[in-house]
From Swiss-Prot:
Phylogenetic classification of the source organism: Archaea, Methanobacteriati, Methanobacteriota, Methanomada group, Methanobacteria
Signal peptide: none
Species this protein is from: Methanothermobacter thermautotrophicus (strain ATCC 29096 / DSM 1053 / JCM 10044 / NBRC 100330 / Delta H) (Methanobacterium thermoautotrophicum)
Segments of this protein annotated with the region NMP: 28-51
Protein name: Putative adenylate kinase
UniProt superkingdom: Archaea
Length: 171
């Protein structure tokens, strides 16, 4: 099972749709959590759903024929054979999140997470060498899907550390 993760707005769901069109069995971790009731509650301050990641990941392991799991928490599943972290320049990400109507506080929280490599760091702490990092900035969804397909087939390697948006925080 390959897990595709990244800050909300980087293109995971769009990419998942393309991979599905290419014949892969893809599931959204967020949808699974909501549909199967793997919800522990709601964060009282930020309003986010708190997911039972262990239960959701355990359920994923039992699913047959599953190729890809996408979601901004998917890298927390220890059973991922490979993790691909999608990255996007924070200014481009800002436009997407604002376009979705995210409140300013949520936008800023996600921009900071992207600039600080939060998903990449978390993924690397759990999965080490099995983590790849892809900068989607300026690339079409189909170009990103081609890169992901190459990574999955072993013909391309995109090790973590090659994408750095930390300077955005200082600018």
């Amino acid at each position: 099972m390959i897990c595709i993760t990244g800050t909300p707005g980087v293109g995971k769901t769009t990419l998942a749709g393309i991979l599905r069109e290419r014949g892969l069995e893809v599931i959204s971790l967020g949808e699974l959590i909501r549909q199967k009731g793997f919800v522990l509650g709601r964060d009282p301050i930020r309003g986010y759903l708190e997911a039972d990641i262990e239960a959701a990941c355990s359920h994923l392991q039992e699913m047959e024929g599953l190729d890809v799991v996408e979601g901004h928490l998917s890298h927390l599943c220890r059973s991922c054979s490979m993790v691909i972290v999608l990255r996007l320049h924070p200014e481009v990400l800002r436009g997407r999140l604002e376009g979705r109507g995210y409140p300013e506080g949520k936008v800023l929280e996600n921009l900071e997470a992207e600039a600080l490599d939060v998903c990449t760091v978390e993924a690397f702490e759990i999965h080490g060498e099995r983590v790849h990092e892809v900068d989607t900035t300026g690339r079409s969804p189909h170009e990103v899907a081609d890169i992901i397909t190459d990574i999955m087939n072993g013909s391309r390697v995109c090790p973590p550390g090659g994408v750095d948006f930390s300077g955005w925080l200082l600018g």
